[in-house]
């Protein structure tokens, strides 16, 4: 009975060592689970970006309004007879308040 107990105890120690420190053990599992979570977050961001790009492609393929909007915003194009006005914010508002005079 003593040899069987010793053999079972040795087997238990070996199994515990393999579980905690061996290949595909608890540490590897937690590391891979963290890697999977990071990859899923990255994939979700890229999927949202792809969906946005596909929607933009559909808009551009669908009609002239999207093309016209892009031409107006990115190239500052206007229709004949229109006047283009660019509104520039006041320099004092951009700097965070009125300019102070140091005397």
UniProtKB/Swiss-Prot annotation:
What are the recorded Gene Ontology BP terms? FtsZ-dependent cytokinesis
Alphabetized UniProt keyword annotations: Cell cycle, Cell division, Cell inner membrane, Cell membrane, Coiled coil, Membrane, Transmembrane, Transmembrane helix
Q: Gene3D superfamilies from the entry?
A: 1.20.5.400
Highest taxon of the lineage: Bacteria
What is the membrane topology noted in the UniProt record heading this document? Single-pass type II membrane protein
Q: Which residues form a coiled coil?
A: 38-62
Q: What is its main location?
A: membrane
Q: Which residues cross the membrane?
A: 4-21
Localization: Cell inner membrane
What Pfam family does this protein match (any one)? DivIC
Enumerate the Cytoplasmic topological stretches.
Answer: 1-3
Outline which residue ranges sit on the Periplasmic face. 22-103
Q: Which GO terms describe its cellular component?
A: cell division site; cell septum; plasma membrane
The record's subunit annotation is: Part of a complex composed of FtsB, FtsL and FtsQ.
This molecule's function is given as: Essential cell division protein. May link together the upstream cell division proteins, which are predominantly cytoplasmic, with the downstream cell division proteins, which are predominantly periplasmic.
Entries under PANTHER family matching the protein? CELL DIVISION PROTEIN FTSB (PTHR37485:SF1)
The record's comment on protein family reads: Belongs to the FtsB family.
Q: What is this protein called?
A: Cell division protein FtsB
Q: Which source organism?
A: Cronobacter sakazakii (strain ATCC BAA-894)
What is this protein's gene name? ftsB
């Amino acid at each position: 009975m003593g040899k069987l107990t010793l053999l079972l105890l040795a087997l238990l120690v070996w199994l515990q060592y393999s579980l905690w420190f061996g290949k595909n053990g608890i540490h590897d599992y937690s590391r891979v689970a963290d890697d999977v979570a990071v990859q899923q977050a990255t994939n979700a961001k890229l999927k949202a970006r792809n969906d946005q790009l596909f929607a933009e492609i559909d808009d551009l393929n669908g009609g002239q309004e999207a093309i016209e909007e892009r031409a107006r915003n990115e190239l500052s194009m206007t229709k004949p007879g229109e006047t283009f006005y660019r509104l520039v914010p006041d320099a004092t508002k951009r700097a965070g308040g009125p300019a102070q005079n140091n005397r």
